[in-house]
Amino acid sequence: MSATMRAEIDPLAHSATVDEMVEAITKGDDSVTTIVDDLVWHATPRFVTEVREVPGLPPSFTTTSVTDMRVDASSEKLMLTLDGQEGSEISCETYMRSCLDLPAFKGFSLFVVTPLEDRVNVLGVAPVILSHRLVLYRPTDLIDFTLCIIQMYLENCSTKRATSSLFVQIECILRNISKTITPLLKMRRLMYIGATWTLNTLMCVTNHNPFDQARVLPNYMMAKMLLGQKSNTPAILDAIYSAGYRQTLSKRPITPCPSGVLRCNKAHLNAPLCTKVVADTLYSWWTATDEKPVPESIYVLYD
């Protein structure tokens, strides 16, 4: 296989490594910044859900609260259509304020994975490790909240909603957000990375030309090439993108996720979230302890 072809089907084929960074630092190479910038793309948030909990009742992990979105041309605000409120819109800012005013709103849960661990239909992470990849994020800044909403919507976007118009509007928002990212805003950068991977991958799997081919999750690109839209694909190919880990590999008991706790409609980019292993891990993680990993526990944050 030629290097050119390999690069086309594997966006990470020529990505930097820690060894390259150490070597560059040793030599005083000016490329260190570029290498570091490339390395941060190897960790991405996935499967964003809104978390709500009322005392005495089971928690709720929701991915379906936003059913449509667009950018208003005059105000340039992100407008949302909420589940059950078709025909009316509210701004993302208004929705953020309403969420933050509700004691039941706990924030967003998300998994931090590598692009190669995202195997299309399952996650290539053992349950014993998967629970340590979960983070609870409760953004109070509109930009950060917007990134969470965008990723959650794109991950659960149906073919009908995945239009060129939507993609252009979201890309414009992300381009503007990228200008606000500084080294101090680590969670914003992480969420921007996630939204960028998700946007380009959704474009790829819905037969649109991605804005950045190098930011299409590699397994989704390969799965599209190998599996296409065929309904009778060879079992060995199905296994590549559907073989995960059994819960028996977990060292601690996993509490089954009750019916209705995770609200998720299967879409192009959220198949792993709909699996029993991931749902049970998410529920067990939430109910096992009151202390959840937050941005402060995964990053060294600066004042």
Curated annotation (Swiss-Prot):
Belongs to the herpesviridae cytoplasmic envelopment protein 1 family. Plays a critical role in cytoplasmic virus egress. Participates in the final step of tegumentation and envelope acquisition within the host cytoplasm. The lineage of its organism: Viruses, Duplodnaviria, Heunggongvirae, Peploviricota, Herviviricetes. Its main location: virion. GO terms for cellular component: host cell Golgi apparatus; viral tegument. Keywords: Host cytoplasm, Host Golgi apparatus, Virion, Virion tegument. InterPro entries: Herpes_UL7. Pfam families: Herpes_UL7. It is found in: Virion; Virion tegument; Host cytoplasm; Host Golgi apparatus. The keyword Mitochondrion does not apply. This is Cytoplasmic envelopment protein 1.
